[in-house]
A protein has these predicted regions:
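Glycine-rich SAM-binding Motif I of class I
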Residues: 83-87
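Class I SAM-dependent methyltransferase Rossmann-like catalytic core
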Residues: 34-64, 70
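A short SAM/SAH-binding and catalytic strip from SAM-dependent methyltransferases
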Residues: 146-165
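A short glycine-rich, Lys/Arg-flanked "PGG" loop and its adjoining helix->strand segment in the class I
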Residues: 90-94, 163-177
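Core SAM-dependent methyltransferase catalytic element
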Residues: 231-257
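Conserved beta-strand signature within the Rossmann-like core of class I S-adenosyl-L-methionine
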Residues: 178-186
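Conserved class I S-adenosyl-L-methionine
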Residues: 72-81
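A short acidic, Gly/Pro-enriched loop at the edge of an enzyme's catalytic core
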Residues: 133, 138-148
């Protein structure tokens, strides 16, 4: 069966309540910014200027609205990098919550500033922890996380020669029933071979949905953030495209039973 046909079959199994929407971006941003928890996280005085300068291009308030972190929840930010999203979620879950920052050994070797001991010099929040594993070796106690976040890194799993399916099985086991996985990434041409998509540092929202549904997750919402400046034939780092790509924010849930 062709990948597109398999994807169509998987999506047909998704609940009718699933919403796939082309976002009214200004309205969505305005609504998200009005959320007191999001506003407090964005205004946190411990945030660096570099992080604040990233907010507008990332439209991060839309991502935080999808994450919907609540006080006391436990989260993991996979492929966390510098901790941009993890630190925002840390503010939202508060002192009784917890956020783990995950990076791979390969990333740490390439970018030494991601090394946990170096990050601990800068990051002082007591509700932050660190996890270092490959994508497919990531593990946690069964049913231990309320939230799993992947910001612009889901495509990296395949790009780096690992299996998204193998990783997703582990994510499913780690997540509490009713918990959610929020994936934001650069959208791709769905008919393009997957290896070609990820070579452009992209992955189509349909491919992600198909893989996550296959792992047992339910697709709850798929918000499409389209840009007039993007051309999905090109690498996301191409001048004129970089920072202005078509993106999606997908929310998946682990069924209660």
């Amino acid at each position: 069966m062709m990948r597109a046909s398999l994807l169509a079959a998987l999506l047909a199994l998704a609940p009718a309540a699933t919403a796939q929407t082309q976002a009214d971006i200004p309205a969505l941003r305005k609504e998200a910014k009005a959320d007191p928890a999001i506003k407090a996280a964005l205004d946190d005085k411990t945030r660096t200027m570099d992080a604040r300068l990233e907010d507008d291009g990332r439209m991060v308030e839309i991502i935080l609205k999808a994450i919907d972190a609540k006080p006391g929840e436990r989260a993991i930010d996979i492929g966390s990098g510098s901790g941009y999203l993890a630190l925002l979620v840390s503010s939202m879950v508060g002192p009784k919550g917890h956020v783990d920052m995950h990076n791979t050994p390969g990333w740490i070797n390439q970018f030494p500033t991601m090394e946990p001991e170096r990050q601990k010099i800068r990051i002082k929040q007591p509700n932050i922890g660190w996890v270092t594993t490959t994508w497919t070796d990531i593990s946690g106690a069964p049913n231990s996380y309320d939230i799993i976040v992947m910001g612009q890194v889901y495509h990296d799993v395949f790009l780096e020669g690992e299996s998204n399916d193998a990783m997703n099985e582990r994510l499913f086991a780690m997540l509490k029933p009713g918990g959610r996985v929020v994936i934001e990434d650069h959208d791709a041409i769905e008919t393009m071979p997957l290896a070609q998509q990820v070579g452009l540092h992209r992955i189509s929202h349909g491919d992600v949905a198909g893989q996550m549904i296959r792992a047992g997750f339910t697709l709850k919402t798929m918000t499409l953030l389209e840009s007039t400046h993007d051309d999905r034939r090109f690498n996301v780092f191409r001048p004129g495209v970089r920072g202005r790509t078509d993106r999606f924010v997908a929310v998946f849930e682990k069924p209660l039973k």
